[in-house]
Amino acid sequence: MKWILVLALVCLAVEYSYSWKVSERCLKGHGKFQADQEIGNGLATAKGQCKGTDSDQKKAGKCDKHCTGVCLGSGGSCGDGSSQKPNKEDCYCKSK
């Protein structure tokens, strides 16, 4: 019975620690950007995260992989010049 209680407490501590870190990242912004919620297309925008990416990197999908990391796994991609993702230097994160 003690082991179940200890396991439950460890799981709660890990979950609390993870949620605290995620909340802290959201409040402070991650590195160089502050995520802004775009109302028109429903995508959160991470400004300037695709700066300096060349066409070879975009072809290899490296930019989109980078954006998925920036978007904390919710899925994301770099702008493509369309009306939904106009700025090619920004990451656009999918809403959860």
Swiss-Prot record:
The keyword Signal applies. Changing residue 58 to A: No significant effect on inhibition of host Nav1.5/SCN5A activity. Disulfide bonds join 26-71, 50-78, 63-91, 67-93. Residues 1-19 form the signal peptide. Changing residue 30 to A: Reduces inhibitory effect on host Nav1.5/SCN5A activity. Keywords: Disulfide bond, Ion channel impairing toxin, Secreted, Signal, Toxin, Voltage-gated sodium channel impairing toxin. The keyword GTP-binding does not apply. GO terms for cellular component: extracellular region. Intravenous injection of the protein shows anti-arrhythmia effects in BaCl(2)-induced arrhythmia models in rats and monkeys. This is Salivary protein FS50. It comes from Xenopsylla cheopis (Oriental rat flea).
